Curated annotation (Swiss-Prot):
Spans traversing the lipid bilayer: 19-39, 49-69, 75-95, 114-134, 138-158
Annotated protein name in UniProt: Terpene cyclase ausL
Source organism per UniProt: Emericella nidulans (strain FGSC A4 / ATCC 38163 / CBS 112.46 / NRRL 194 / M139)
Highest taxon above the source species: Eukaryota
Miscellaneous remark of the record: In A.calidoustus, the austinoid gene cluster lies on a contiguous DNA region, while clusters from E.nidulans and P.brasilianum are split in their respective genomes. Genetic rearrangements provoked variability among the clusters and E.nidulans produces the least number of austionoid derivatives with the end products austinol and dehydroaustinol, while P.brasilianum can produce until acetoxydehydroaustin, and A.calidoustus produces the highest number of identified derivatives.
Lineage: Eukaryota, Fungi, Dikarya, Ascomycota, Pezizomycotina
Encoding gene, per UniProt annotation: ausL
InterPro entries with a match to the protein in the record: PaxB-like
Gene Ontology molecular function, alphabetical: lyase activity
EC number(s) recorded for this UniProt protein: 4.2.3.-
Keywords: Lyase, Membrane, Transmembrane, Transmembrane helix
């Protein structure tokens, strides 16, 4: 967050830019809490707390905008890098207990197959995120690529509950942090567009 942005927030705390920045902070804390809670719940229940698609999409998005297009994430850059490392911890815990989630299937018989599955899906999503950034520009690609991550995270969580038939691997903290972060991130995007922080007619 630049010194100019901070001064504007102090001068106009209820402006679109100020509210957007405060919502970004809320989203940053919320998602970090969500990822840490997923690591804990996965270890405690010995069952992945996140499905394949949202985890792989998240890691691909974070890799793209933390290391390939860091300028597109602006002052989110440091946060996205923190999320990337937190997600590697989530991935490690997930791969450790993923065979329990795939028991009775060919994938569940070999951890190596699961590693290849996750690697392939991450690579596919990374290619998609890169194409999105090239087509729309980094600024819009950052936000719309993140929106895809949020959609998959929420919908796949519901899918896990329905297919598993129990709440192991899930918790109120995970769901609550995700809901708050999603709401904060969506409204922050709207505020960025309104304030002009995210251009809607040019590539970055």
């Amino acid at each position: 967050m630049s010194q100019l942005t901070i001064s504007k927030i102090i001068e106009e705390p209820f402006s679109a830019l100020s509210l957007s920045e405060m919502l970004k902070i809320l989203a940053a804390l919320g998602w970090s809490t969500n990822y840490l809670a997923m690591v804990y719940r996965t270890q405690a229940d010995k069952l992945p707390a996140i499905a394949v698609l949202p985890l792989c999409c998240d890691i691909a998005w974070e890799f793209t905008y933390a290391w390939i297009y860091p300028q597109a994430s602006g002052h989110w850059q440091g946060v996205v890098r923190v999320w990337f490392f937190l997600h590697t911890a989530v991935l490690a815990a997930t791969l450790r207990y993923a065979p329990n989630d795939w028991a009775g299937t060919p994938l569940g018989e070999s951890r190596g197959r699961l590693v290849l599955l996750y690697a392939a899906v991450i690579a596919a999503f990374a290619a998609g995120q890169l194409c999105l950034a090239l087509e729309m520009g980094g600024a819009l690609g950052f936000h719309w690529g993140g929106a895809l991550c949020q959609f998959l995270s929420s919908s796949a969580a519901v899918g896990q509950l329905l297919t598993r038939g129990h709440t192991r691997g899930a918790s109120l903290l995970i769901w609550g942090a995700r809901a708050i972060s999603t709401a904060g991130g969506d409204r922050a995007l709207i505020g960025c567009v309104v304030s002009g922080a995210v251009p809607i007619d040019q590539k970055a």
